[in-house]
Amino acid sequence: MAETPKTILIVDDDRELVEALRTMLERHGYRVMQAHDGHQGKQAIYNQRPDLVILDMMMPRMGGYPVLEHFRGKTDAPPIIMITANEGSRHKAYAEWLGVVDYIRKPFAMERLLEAVQRGLQGDSAKEAPAQDEKE
């Protein structure tokens, strides 16, 4: 019997990026859902129970940090990968303190994100991963 595909929620207001990520993830056997701001993302996390979330930091209405703050420390929260165009190391440190499994700066190689997704689903954090995009 085939294993049920893992569900990934992408929360990002950049529709082109969301479609590119959707295509790549579906090609690798994942089921993909999407939300376009933090409010929609929070609702989808509660209602759809994704296995992993890819979360943008900067979005209209509600960005990624309030979502991270809301789910911080909750044992039933899915692993979250934050993606951002922000270069600040303080932002990365705060996101890590809030519990992200990885923090990836845009633009990024799709392979980099796919590796982070695979590690996140296995329960491994970015701390064990090679830091190839560390431009502090």
Q: Where does each model-flagged region fall?
A:
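Charged docking surfaces used in two-component/phosphorelay signaling
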Residues: 19-27
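Receiver (REC) domain active-site loop signature in two-component systems and cognate sites
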Residues: 59
